[in-house]
Design a protein with these regions (language model features):
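Short coil/turn segments at helix-helix junctions and helix-capping linkers
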Residues: 1-3, 14-18, 28-40
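Short intrinsically disordered, low-complexity coil segments enriched in acidic
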Residues: 1-9, 242
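Residue-level signature of alpha-solenoid helical repeat scaffolds
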Residues: 7-11, 24, 28, 43-47, ...
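Eukaryotic basic, amphipathic alpha-helical target segments in cytosolic regions
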Residues: 13-20, 34, 49-56
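Alpha-helical solenoid scaffolds in eukaryotic proteins
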Residues: 21-28, 87, 121
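Long internal repeat-built scaffold domains in very large eukaryotic proteins
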Residues: 42-243
Length: 243
């Protein structure tokens, strides 16, 4: 059952130190599942993120006096809750229902709506009551276009679209809550099994025929794309996550 699988993933991460890769699939519960399953997944993610934050804090404390600050920031990020987000982007880019490039770009990107809701579900839980993750999460999503898919370069477009949607979710949330996003003081260390660095940022399709390619944040976001709230159920503290 979904609840049993959710429980196993939560237990594996919080009790046995499994990496964030195993947390990303829980966001898929945001779409096509009943409210009980969504709540179970949201509560599990909240528990997982709390555990990961402790893990990252313990790592920092352990190596603060022996590790260079830049290396410490980069390495501690790989232990953090927000490091789940790149894995979810990768997972969604490989999702069998991800629309083609042409279908996704049509009708203001409506075909990406379920994927946005899954990203919103994760981000809403990740930022519940805290803005600590925003600088690193935003930087990772912004720099995703300096990578290609390490397993299949032809799927890289999906990475860029998902990262742009996640970036939109993060920035809109920060605006709604009046949070300063700040700058993450370190480089990003990408999991090499999933992402391969490249020298230049990937370019998106021009806004009009014959125009210059789009570059930078939102370069791959469908024109006219707007966010729709995810069905984020109440968590254990009684508050709803907001996308």
């Amino acid at each position: 059952s979904p609840a049993e699988m959710i429980g196993k993933l939560e237990h594996g991460i919080t009790k046995h130190g499994l990496p964030q890769t195993f947390a990303a699939p829980l966001a898929l519960c945001a779409v096509g599942h009943d409210s009980v399953t969504r709540k179970t997944a949201a509560d599990a993610l909240a528990s997982i993120f709390s555990s990961l934050r402790r893990r990252a804090a313990e790592f920092r404390e352990r190596y603060a006096s022996t590790m260079d600050a830049a290396v410490l920031n980069r390495t501690a990020l790989t232990q953090s809750a927000e490091y789940t987000l790149p894995y979810l982007v990768f997972l969604l880019a490989h999702h069998p229902d991800l629309p083609s490039k042409e279908t996704g770009a049509a009708n203001k990107g409506v075909a990406y709506r379920p994927f946005q809701q899954m990203l919103s579900f994760l981000v809403g839980t990740l930022t519940a009551g805290s803005k600590q993750c925003l600088p690193a999460a935003i930087k990772m999503m912004s720099l995703m276009k300096r990578t290609v898919d390490a397993t299949n370069v032809d799927l890289s477009h999906g990475l860029y679209v998902m990262a742009d949607i996640a970036l939109l979710v993060l920035n809109k949330l920060a605006t709604q809550k009046g949070w300063e996003t700040g700058q993450f003081p370190g480089q990003i260390s990408w999991p090499k099994a999933f992402f391969t660095l490249q020298e230049r940022r990937a370019k998106g399709e021009p806004l009009e025929e014959g125009g210059a390619p789009r570059v930078g944040d939102y370069s791959h976001l469908p024109v006219g794309f707007e966010l729709k709230s995810a069905a984020a159920p109440k968590q254990a503290d009684g508050h709803r996550s907001k996308a």
